[in-house]
Amino acid sequence: METTAIIRGVHISAQKTRLVADLIRGKSVAQALNILTFSPKKAAVILKKAVESAIANAEHNDGADIDELKVTTIFVDKAQSMKRFSARAKGRGNRIEKQTCHITVKVGA
């Protein structure tokens, strides 16, 4: 039985988040949390919350044993980007896109 946790509209680019997501794909839950705890990246903190949420969902909804859970699937999708304006010299302006992403984590035995 797989249990899912989805976090939508996270303020970090999908490309940066995928780098960390690749580290924990297929690992046991304890090992994944250990990797994320000691990773210095911002995405690691966000992914750790997502994995912990998936564990809590599995325990509460399915009555799963935490020791047997693995990160079966994890993927990061690009979400809507926020358009911002940055003033430049001589009355010009540049558009800045602030990236967001959706994170989906599935845990199962």
UniProtKB/Swiss-Prot annotation:
It comes from the Bacteria. InterPro entries: Ribosomal_uL22, Ribosomal_uL22_bac/chlpt-type, Ribosomal_uL22_bac/org-type, Ribosomal_uL22_CS, Ribosomal_uL22_sf. GO terms for cellular component: cytosolic large ribosomal subunit. One of its GO terms (molecular function) is rRNA binding. The keyword Ribosomal protein applies. The keyword Transit peptide does not apply. GO terms for biological process: translation. Pfam families: Ribosomal_L22. Belongs to the universal ribosomal protein uL22 family. HAMAP family: Ribosomal_uL22_B. Part of the 50S ribosomal subunit. This protein binds specifically to 23S rRNA; its binding is stimulated by other ribosomal proteins, e.g. L4, L17, and L20. It is important during the early stages of 50S assembly. It makes multiple contacts with different domains of the 23S rRNA in the assembled 50S subunit and ribosome. This is Large ribosomal subunit protein uL22. The lineage of its organism: Bacteria, Pseudomonadati, Pseudomonadota, Betaproteobacteria, Burkholderiales. The gene is rplV.
